[in-house]
Every structure is written in C-alpha cells, then in structure tokens.
A protein has these predicted regions:
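N-terminal cap/lid segment of alpha/beta-hydrolase-fold proteins
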Residues: 1-28
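Catalytic nucleophile-loop/oxyanion-hole region of alpha/beta-hydrolase
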Residues: 71-101
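Short beta-strand/loop motif that positions the catalytic acidic residue
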Residues: 191-193, 198-200, 204
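Catalytic active-site module of serine/aspartate enzymes centered on a nucleophile-bearing elbow/loop
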Residues: 231-275
Length: 275
C-alpha cells in the first residue's frame, strides 16, 4: 500500500509552532484520526505509529503532532500546561478541518487522553473519541506517584522525577500541577456527544483504574470501557500493544465509516482528493 506522509506545522493560539505529520492512504478520504501522545513522549510514539499504520490500511488518514516543548514543537517543556495542550489539540482539529477533512476522530494516550477528552468537550462536531489509559484526574495521579515529600520537592525545586524511567530529574513548573487541578475530566465527559472508547490495562502502574470507571460513568454518549487483563500502562508486552491498538483502530473504523472507494491523488493542501 502506497502511504504518503507529509511533515506539516501549524501555530497554536499563543503563536508557538506545533510540528505534525499528516499520513494518508492512496484513495480519497475525508476521514482522519488525530493522535495525541502522552507525557514526555512525542508524535512518533510506538502507539501512534502502530495505530497510524492500522488506520491507513483501512483507509483513514492520520495526523499526529507534538505538544508544546516535546518532539519538534517549540517551547521549553517546563512551561507545558494542560490548558495550553488543550488549545493545541483544538488548533489541530481546526487545522485538519482546513485541509478538507470532515469526519474527524480524536485519539489520546495518558496525558494526551486527558487533553483529548477536554478538547472533545469543546468540539461538538467530533465524530468519535478513543482514550488509551486517560488521566481524568491528573492531580490525583501525581500525588500518588510522587507522595507528599515528592510534591514538596517539586514545589521547591521546579523539577520532577523522570517518569519515563531515566535517572535524572525533569524541569517542570509547579504551575503544571495547579493548572491540572482546574481541568478534571469528569465534568467535561458529561457534555461530550461523540461515541467514546476507554482502554486501560488492569496492571496500570500509574493511572488508578477507578479513574477510568468513574469517567465511563460520567459519559452520557455512546461509550465502551475495555479493561485488558495483565496489561500495564505502556502495554509493554507485544500482545497487549497489538490488542490495544486493534481495539482503538476498530473504534475509529466503526465510527468513521468508509465511503465508496475511489482512486485518489494528493492535492496541495495535503488531503487526498479524487483524481
């Protein structure tokens, strides 16, 4: 299958350059899934790349981008906030819509899951939403992960442990935590109209399972909760990664149904259009 990837960039509402990659199949489509990566990750995360391949094979374009201060996007990571990340997700939605995509799905992983959830609550035209181990209560997760002493150290030093497993500490303003407290996902879930999927492993070592269950209960739209036995936060085992990405892809395909296939070409805007 001939897949085209195009490096693109757009500006967030505060003027920062956001780096992204638009990938589309050879046939015309107005369907696209926007992929939001996790904390201290980037647009080329394993989940994003595997999921992009699965969706492209089924005729759905993908757009993956880097949040502020991560990957190739502008900004010092230490100044990232949930508020800014949501603005960037909404800007990404506007960006793909400007490229001619009309049926748009949104996928978010962990931190990106919270961001996608909040963005979906402000984008009623969204066709579907898929969340991989989302963190609707980020403050709770941070408090559990760092403990009282770690939270105090963060406030004093402006650094946190490297949650990706590195030996050092990462610069991050304490204002990130304070901003998180203003952006819990449960209330946002109540106004989302798009069909919503939640996938999490029952051995997630970071995000408490009760958050996904409470989030599921708060959703008023069509919804589905998948708890995968034995899977950790990163879906480290190949079989867990395969199952998780397949479930996400199937949800997108179900709620972004295919039009009659036709040969296509790539126009200057980046979307696939009929020849």
């Amino acid at each position: 299958m001939a897949v085209v990837e195009q490096a693109l960039a757009f500006k967030d509402p505060e003027g920062h350059r956001v780096s992204g990659i638009l990938a589309f199949p050879p046939s015309h489509t107005d369907r696209v899934a926007i992929l939001c990566h996790g904390f201290l990750s980037n647009k080329n995360s394993t989940t994003n790349k595997v999921l992009s391949t699965l969706l492209l094979e089924r005729g759905i374009a993908t757009f993956r981008f880097d949040f502020f201060g991560q990957g190739e996007s502008e900004g010092p990571f230490e100044q990232i906030t949930v508020s800014l990340a949501v603005k960037e997700a909404l800007a990404a939605l506007n960006f793909v819509a400007s490229k001619g995509y009309r049926r748009i799905g949104l996928v978010g992983s962990s931190f990106g899951g919270l961001v996608a959830l909040l963005a979906a609550s402000e984008w009623p035209a969204l066709s579907c939403l898929a969340l991989k181990c989302p963190v609707p209560d980020f403050p709770e997760m941070l408090e559990l992960e760092f403990g009282q002493h770690g939270m105090a150290e963060w406030k004093t030093t402006g650094t946190i442990p490297d949650v990706t497993g590195g030996p050092g500490r990462v610069k991050l303003q304490y204002g990130f935590y304070e901003d998180c407290a203003r952006h819990l996902g449960y209330d946002a879930a109540k106004v989302i109209t798009a069909p919503t999927l939640i996938v999490q492993g029952d051995r997630d070592e970071y995000v408490p399972l009760h958050q996904s269950r409470r989030l599921y209960d708060a959703l008023q739209s069509e919804k589905r909760l998948e708890i995968l036995a034995g899977a950790d936060h990163r879906f480290s085992r190949p079989e867990d990664l395969r199952r998780m990405t397949t479930i996400l892809a199937d949800w997108m395909v179900q709620h972004l149904p295919a039009e009659r296939p036709e040969p296509g070409r790539v126009d200057d805007a980046g979307a696939s259009t009929p020849a």
